[in-house]
Amino acid sequence: MIRAETKPIEWVVMGGAGKLAPENTMAALIEGLARGVDHVWLDLQVSKDGVPFLFRDKRLERTTNARGIAHSLDWKHLKQLDASDGHHVAAGPERIPALTEVLDWLQSADIRMILEIRATDRMLARLLPALAKACQQMPRASEKLSFASGSTTAVVRCGEVLRGKGRLLIVDKPKRPILLAAQEMGVGSVGCTAMNWTEKRVRNAREYDLEATAFAVRNCNDAKRLIKVGVKRLCIDDIDIKHRYDSSMS
């Protein structure tokens, strides 16, 4: 086990490039990599006909030119949508990527990836076999993946289907009963919003051999506080937070 005091800080960029490109798109991954991002957080769903794809929201309206529930559509419809609709820096239409497209890119990219499983228990029956197959077909990409979910069912099932992969449980507050449950599931990390991590809670997580992951890190001051209390994985929407932190420490 790596001692918490010596483990390097991990900066995980949400959506691939934060606010610099349409989230969960190939454009975001390419932009993030070009800016030196080495760890990203993307969101995984499954289409009505069983194709895993990258998309965050349940509904399509916020980021596409369509309306409706994303996972209720077949892949032939989803892949035609513009996933950059309304984004302030989008240079042109961006398609919703299939998981296989992302993993094919990841095979040669020097970057790690957390995939958040955004699926109901019923949808897991479609998603997990397709996910496992894609990982088997592209092992160089698979070794760079870990998985997260706020669903205990999804976390447990991922452990059964994708053996040996890192897993993270998303929680509201990292209280001891939750930490114990996470440890019993065999996950390596628990994640919650930045405001819910205190030094005591980080210490409690370590007692259960769990890494603390913080979401909604809004600025450099947030980052400094979290690092001071012992959080080693920070999830950010703004890549410049890391740059400002690095500058302040040099």
Residue ranges, per PLM feature:
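Phosphate-group recognition and catalysis centered on beta-loop-alpha active-site segments
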Residues: 1-250
